């Protein structure tokens, strides 16, 4: 028999939540899918001929890009031969330096990285983040938007946000043709509030690049990458086109970061039976291979997908750690 107090608590909406049953065949699984590949690597004449159980002849465009651009070959065979649990313990060990860890992890394949972080519990993942994060001083980003896309209000709000200490500001646009007004209003307002604040206007990628080239924005981060070939193709993209876009931003001196996150592939219906974390490890490998300055990940807009399956939030934390490895 329960008291009325516990009956009332149990009836609250927040306590009606539950988890979706895992469905590995369609990728509705956060970690350790039975269909995830086993880590492996073979190098011949300075070229990766096998990666994660797949021969080069069978590589899709992500595999080819990752093999050619995202893995340090000099130490790869030695690093891949190490026991995953040993690497995981090194990540947590306060006596092992960040540089020593990177010497190993930058030579690992996506499947191996997934296996390594899979050995860690949530507290160990946080300990690893404490050591592995590259940024010495944390900074905050804010969004400055309003229902009517009123540039005067955007400028005023941006100025206040600058005074409050935000390092980056983003605006989004309801009507695409208003984008230049929003971008300029955000830029002017932010600099009035505190000179040096970085601003962006999130749009379709070609338009966003144009705004940057014209000097209306100072960074971009909504350059999405995905973990399977069909999702890339759904957006008329490839890892190579994204890398080219990154070089365009770099040529103008604009800061930019890729965007990815666990759950996007299963949400699009093209997870190929792989776990969300493994697919995100592939995204992060593409990000590193393209040489961009950073990544916006942690599931972001897809958080409801991993959060709805067992171990999902642990997988999101694990992908953040992989981004630092």
Residue ranges of predicted features:
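Anaerobic metallocofactor- and corrinoid-dependent redox/one-carbon enzyme cores
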Residues: 1-155, 163, 170-325
